[in-house]
């Protein structure tokens, strides 16, 4: 183990001096190296899908063969009022993917967060009836999925429906329809586009309670003949969580249901969490404290090396099980694009992605490419 660490650190130093230049000259890229392993994807924001962030666009085109919409397909954006859809940004996103021959992922159809305020309530703010919510869900899902039928490879149909302990999250959807809202969402999506792949996506999937609940949910869907193609394991990870062994246990457990695995929303935070138990709960918010923002001017060398080793270890795991995984998606192009800078505490400086704030590949990119090239 000690020898492995020494070798990795030596490689990291070497790549930090040479990889950016080599990367530019020899045509190396993540998507080329991973071509026969799995899709390598990235979330894009509207500045990128519109072409305004030119440097980011070049990174995306060179390194990634799949894209997912970071925000523009969430209901609060695409369907802000019951009888009003805003398709402009989503249309632009899909066109960007098509023009660059990418596998396009729709994110997400049913999610309790960033939910259009009208969706589950009447004009007085009271919960609508089960019949009304079913109708609204079907209209929302059918309208969006049919619009992009044949153009989007797959959809995150339901997002983050399970708690760490395995209980169903007490969302408006659950309050009104119970757990039945999940099979209904998958049913409506399949009816709208029978050829589209359908996914369930969630965070903290290494938690045993969530692992067991997701396995049960997927098995129940399959027993009922409801299509589900893959489980998305969000990769919002830290330097000391989750244990790679627990993450691997979940991968194998999910694969045991007969569906494929997707590593989604991958980022590795290097700054401390004000609460280690928030997972990736977007509603979490803490007041800024200077001591919780330890690296505003850059990472110390030892911290950078440790980050490189940890990210490389996860990619080594993904490559080990590339027969089970169909896609690995980063949650952002370069460090300055990451939501981690403002969650769960606004105004911090984090370094969670594969490309730095100057749009340069980090040393780990070279290590991933090397690892992919030697993986059978």
UniProtKB/Swiss-Prot annotation:
Description of what induces expression: By xylan.
Classification via InterPro entries: GH10 (IPR044846), GH10_AS (IPR031158), GH10_dom (IPR001000), Glycoside_hydrolase_SF (IPR017853)
Enzyme class: hydrolase
Keywords assigned by UniProt, alphabetized: Carbohydrate metabolism, Glycosidase, Hydrolase, Polysaccharide degradation, Signal, Xylan degradation
Active-site residues per Swiss-Prot or TrEMBL entry: 160 (proton donor), 265 (nucleophile)
KW Signal (keyword) present: yes
EC number assigned by the record: 3.2.1.8
Pathway(s) it belongs to: Glycan degradation; xylan degradation
One term of GO molecular function: endo-1,4-beta-xylanase activity
Keyword Membrane appears in the UniProt entry: no
Any single Pfam family the record assigns to this protein: Glyco_hydro_10
Reaction catalysed by this enzyme: Endohydrolysis of (1->4)-beta-D-xylosidic linkages in xylans
TM ranges: none
One Gene Ontology biological process: xylan catabolic process
Residues of the GH10 domain: 25-371
Signal peptide annotation: 1-24
Sequence similarity: Belongs to the glycosyl hydrolase 10 (cellulase F) family.
Protein name: Endo-1,4-beta-xylanase A
Organism of provenance: Bacteroides ovatus
Gene designation: xylI
């Amino acid at each position: 183990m000690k020898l492995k660490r020494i070798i990795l650190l030596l490689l990291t130093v070497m790549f930090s001096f040479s990889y950016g230049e080599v990367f530019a000259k020899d045509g190396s890229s993540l998507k080329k190296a991973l071509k026969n392993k799995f899709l390598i994807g990235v979330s894009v924001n509207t500045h990128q899908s519109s072409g305004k962030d030119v440097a980011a666009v070049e990174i995306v085109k060179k390194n990634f063969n799949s894209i997912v919409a970071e925000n523009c397909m969430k209901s609060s954006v695409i369907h802000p009022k019951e009888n009003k859809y805003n398709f402009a940004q989503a249309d632009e996103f899909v066109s960007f993917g098509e023009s660059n021959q990418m596998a396009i992922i729709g994110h997400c159809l049913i999610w309790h967060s960033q939910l259009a305020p009208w969706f589950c309530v009447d004009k007085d703010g009271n919960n609508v009836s089960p019949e009304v919510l079913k109708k609204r869900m079907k209209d929302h899902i059918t309208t969006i999925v049919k619009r992009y039928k044949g153009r989007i490879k797959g959809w995150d149909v339901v997002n983050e429906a399970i708690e760490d302990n395995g209980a169903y999250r007490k969302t408006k959807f659950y309050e009104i329809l119970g757990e039945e809202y999940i099979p209904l969402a998958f049913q409506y999506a399949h009816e709208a586009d029978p050829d589209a792949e359908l996914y369930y996506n969630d965070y903290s999937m290494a938690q045993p309670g969530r692992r067991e609940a997701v396995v049960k949910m997927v098995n129940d869907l399959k027993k009922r003949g409801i299509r589900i193609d893959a489980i998305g394991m969000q990769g919002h990870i830290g330097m000391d969580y989750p244990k790679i062994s627990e993450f691997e246990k979940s991968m194998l457990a999910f694969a045991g249901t007969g569906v494929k695995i997707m590593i989604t929303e991958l980022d590795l935070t290097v700054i401390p969490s004000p609460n280690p138990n928030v997972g990736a709960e977007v509603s979490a918010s803490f007041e800024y404290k200077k001591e919780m923002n330890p690296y505003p001017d850059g990472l110390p060398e030892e911290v950078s090396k440790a980050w490189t080793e940890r990210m490389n270890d996860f990619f080594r795991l993904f490559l080990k099980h590339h027969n089970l995984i169909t896609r690995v998606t980063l949650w952002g192009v370069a460090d300055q694009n990451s939501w981690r800078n403002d969650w769960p505490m606004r105004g911090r400086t984090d370094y969670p992605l594969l490309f730095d704030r100057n749009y340069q590949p980090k040393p780990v990119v070279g290590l991933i490419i090397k690892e992919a090239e030697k993986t059978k």
